[in-house]
């Protein structure tokens, strides 16, 4: 069975377009896996905030603030993208900013709380913008009865991409820890790995 059967796609949509769309999920899933879930959250609490009593709350507030920004601004951004046919351009711009902000996370050292906060808010807002913008392409790609199926292709690619990024990062972390390197040396490298895959 073909991976992207033509009958699931709208007329004129090429399979390589769907593949490219699904690969965006492959590329960006490392951000949530490594930055939000497995690596940087712990680094933020223990290193950037130096393990303070309020450190976990600070991380929660950073994520909440970035989510609130997205909630307040995404409707206007989406309307602009639709009205001016700028989805692809905005997706490219928000992706580039998210990648740059993820690279900036590599600059965070002990006590660099505000660098971490600013870079996290920017990266998470732009990641979320990218998620919404790429989802907006789905009706253009898939027939109405196949949207769930085509969306599932993107999700499955995303799982593979997230696991690849996490695998690369954890392999490096284990290598670095075996050599006695501190988190301030190996966690920044994992941010660069994540940004590179993105």
What are the language-model segments listed below?
Residues 184-198:
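Symmetry-related core transmembrane helices of the 12-TM Major Facilitator Superfamily/SLC fold
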Residues 119-157:
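Cytoplasmic helix-loop-helix junction between adjacent transmembrane helices
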Residues 71, 92-112:
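C-terminal ends and interior cores of transmembrane alpha-helices
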Residues 4-67, 114-117:
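Helix-loop boundary and gating motifs at the non-cytosolic
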Residues 56-79, 100, 166:
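Central cavity-lining transmembrane alpha-helices of secondary-active solute carriers
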């Amino acid at each position: 069975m073909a991976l992207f059967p033509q009958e699931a796609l709208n007329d004129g949509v090429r399979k390589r377009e769907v593949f490219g769309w699904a690969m965006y999920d492959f590329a960006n899933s490392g951000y949530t896996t490594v930055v939000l879930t497995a690596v940087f959250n712990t680094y933020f609490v223990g290193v950037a905030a130096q393990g303070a009593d309020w450190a976990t709350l600070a991380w929660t507030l950073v994520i909440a603030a970035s989510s609130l920004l997205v909630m307040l601004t995404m409707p206007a951004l989406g309307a602009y993208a639709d009205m001016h046919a700028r989805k692809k351009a905005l997706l490219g711009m928000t992706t580039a900013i998210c990648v740059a902000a993820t690279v900036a996370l590599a600059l965070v050292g002990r006590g660099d709380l505000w660098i971490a906060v600013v870079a996290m808010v920017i990266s998470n807002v732009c990641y979320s913008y990218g998620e919404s913008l790429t989802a907006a392409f789905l009706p253009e790609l898939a027939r109405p009865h196949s949207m769930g199926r085509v969306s599932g292709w993107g999700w499955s690619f995303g799982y593979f991409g997230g696991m690849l990024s996490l695998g690369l990062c954890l392999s490096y972390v284990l290598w670095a820890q075996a050599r006695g390197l501190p988190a301030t040396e190996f966690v920044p490298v994992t941010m660069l790995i994540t940004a590179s895959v993105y």
